[in-house]
Amino acid sequence: MKNLEIKRHYNLDYKNTNLLKKFVSVDGKILPKYITVLKPKNQRKLSKAIKLSRIAGLLKFLNN
């Protein structure tokens, strides 16, 4: 899997599901830092945005 990154012009928001789907595995798990190559602050923001999106019903909890 290739390394992913968040560009500066992207808005890391829980409603931006197209961006968040890039950081979720096929199983529905949040990708770890060594794959996303994000700084710790951005990794935390990403995981919070994914969790909020799941609670809001925009992303699935698990992909079966």
Swiss-Prot record:
Signal sequence coordinates: none
One GO term of the biological process aspect: translation
Protein name: Small ribosomal subunit protein bS18c
UniProtKB keywords: Chloroplast, Plastid, Ribonucleoprotein, Ribosomal protein, RNA-binding, rRNA-binding
Keyword Repeat: no
Family: Belongs to the bacterial ribosomal protein bS18 family.
Lineage summary: Eukaryota, Sar, Rhizaria, Cercozoa, Chlorarachniophyceae
Gene that this sequence comes from: rps18
Subcellular location: Plastid, Chloroplast
GO cellular component, one term: mitochondrial small ribosomal subunit
Disulphide linkage map: none
